[in-house]
Amino acid sequence: MRGILYGVGVGPGDPELMTLKAVRLIKENDIIAVPGAEVRETVAYKIAVQAVPELADKELLPIYMPMTHDKAELELNHEKGAKALEAALDTGKNVVFLTLGDPTIYSTFSYVQKRVEADGYETRLVSGITSFCATAARLNIPLTEWNQPLHVQPAVHRLDSELDQPGTYVLMKSGKKMNQVKEILAKSGRNIRMVENCGMPDEHIYNSVEEIPDDAGYYSCLLYTSPSPRD
């Protein structure tokens, strides 16, 4: 009998924000897959091992996920990752794949999940706290009130033409484009706040667009808000 592949969110950075279910699945299963070549150096592993010290003694399966826009290279590595997971599942053991935040939000897990499912294997998703929910909590502010919409998107090329709707915008994957993002947001007149490395030891909070450094890291989450509908 084949094992089940679990995509488990470990939250944004603070190990105390990991769910009870995530902790239980890591404890109960022997094979833990982690996106990255050097598993013990990955952010997901470092978060999870603080909550589940037993993780250090588990069988760790590295799944290489390169940070590139080369579609051919991505496809090749996603396929290799899926095959490595399938080989582990064929032993009859479950595999727990650790992913930052929640596995349904810009997660590397989704790329291998589709391939593994297409080959007839069972997969299950286990929710984790998202980086943007943790960011709002860290800033002690609501993401939405009353009938305000919430927009979640990466910082893309046409950002200036996409931020004209009411509500709150969550801008993710802004690190490499931070200078451009700041220029656009500075013209908006809205409230801009950001948390870099939320919940991690090197966390930084920025309360205005002027405070945000151009070289902010990859794990930076911006909140771009309009005034409260009750104001």
Feature locations, PLM:
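Conserved anion/nucleotide-ligand pocket segment
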Residues: 165-193
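Short, well-ordered beta-strand core segments
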Residues: 31-32, 169, 222
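Class I S-adenosyl-L-methionine
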Residues: 1-15, 20-23, 27-121, 210-212
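Short, flexible loop segments at boundaries between secondary-structure elements
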Residues: 129-132, 194-204
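Class I SAM-dependent methyltransferase SAM-binding "motif I" and its flanking Rossmann-like core
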Residues: 104-165
